[in-house]
Amino acid sequence: MSGPIGLEVQHPETEYRLKKVSEKFIESIHLMVNEPSVGLYRIQEHVRRSLPQLVDKKMELRSCQNQINGVCYDLDYSIKTVQSMQHIPHFTIIQECLRSAIASKKNLDAAKLERRSKKVDEGSGAQSADAVSEVSIETQDVEGFICPNCMQVLTSQDELLEHWQSQHETANDTRQGYNDDANNDQD
């Protein structure tokens, strides 16, 4: 009898044991050679497929984070700006000027309607003195600054601010306190 390598084996049990050992040895070598490489190959394929997607998602996440940080900064800045606007006296003066301008416009409109009704009553003759004065009022230039509360004419904006703070600031604070009390009563 000749063995797998060309050696002659004399005993059948030894041949069986040699065959069994060689099979186990070949199987072990096969597992050592192939199994880790297959596992590493699978891991490598998984990384190759998923890594670009993960990198893209991470870059997208950083971009979103930068946008959110920018929007948060803008929002905080806007909130601080709006809160600081509550303490600017110019807006109070502008509000009073707007109220005064609206009241003046209503008075002018009422006067214009009154003149028209007088014209209709008098007839369609020559222009009356009221119509001429109306034109001169509309085209007259105004120089300086006018306090909307007391209609005092001042020469500069700084004078107007000082006048407003000294004369009308306490009245405005009192009015604000009254409005706050009224709002608290409603709650």
UniProtKB/Swiss-Prot annotation:
Keywords: Lysosome, Membrane. It is found in: Lysosome membrane. Its main location: membrane. Residues 165-187 are annotated as: Disordered. GO terms for cellular component: BORC complex; lysosomal membrane. Disulfide bonds: none annotated. It holds the Pfam family BORCS8. May participate in the coupling of lysosomes to microtubule plus-end-directed kinesin motor. Belongs to the BORCS8 family. This is BLOC-1-related complex subunit 8 homolog.
